[in-house]
Amino acid sequence: DSLFDLAPWVFLFLIPAITMRSFAEERRNGTIELLFTKPLTDTQIILSKYIGGLVLVLFSLLPTLIYYFSIRELGNPSGNIDNGGTFGSYIGLLLIGATFVSVGIFCSSLTQNQVVAFIVAVFLCFFLYLGFDLIASFSTFGNLDSFVRGMGIYEHYQSVKRGVVDTRDILYFITVIALFVLFTKFILEKRKRKTLPQFFITTAIVIVLNFIGSFQFWRFDLTEEKIHSLSPATVDFLQNK
């Protein structure tokens, strides 16, 4: 658990450092216009930057497998580890990493100063990760506190980290990633007309899909002993009550 508790905080600084050059350096060198004259769409250019950052995040996760295999072999008996739960935790880390990359790419598109891009990305990633949870902890919104908490990454990551993959959590991460890719596209396409209406329409569609997905969902308990699921006997008992 300590690995998966610490890793998001490492990502909080590592990923902005990886992504801060994405577009900021292009702006500083004056090559961004040249970049967009290539036979690629703006979306393809943004996604190529995004995928490049995501690949580096994947490589940064590989050394942590040593920790997993060490714990697995040193267990008593050997192999005494919840593989399903660990797999779920890695899914959560990957989703956080993918989200932070999209935030970092967006922040890099805002400025030509890499340091500014880094600082803004760190702040925004921190707010998305823990900010909403901190706001909800003050009970400012009453009955809406759970909704506010659900707007942040921390709530969804804790669910996945336990080894429970809920389509609502997956959809949340996909939505946040898509929104920041759209924000990046909007910033880089400000020179074009008709961008603003398309931006708002696409953003609204993404949010509506996420809202619909909160009502129709599936939940998968990856833990080997299904510790986060009701047993068949309990389900039968509750149905007969």
Which residues does each predicted region cover?
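Hydrophobic/aromatic residues in alpha-helical transmembrane segments
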Residues: I15-T19, Y67, V103, F183-T184, ...
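Juxtamembrane extramembrane loops of integral membrane proteins
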Residues: V208-K241
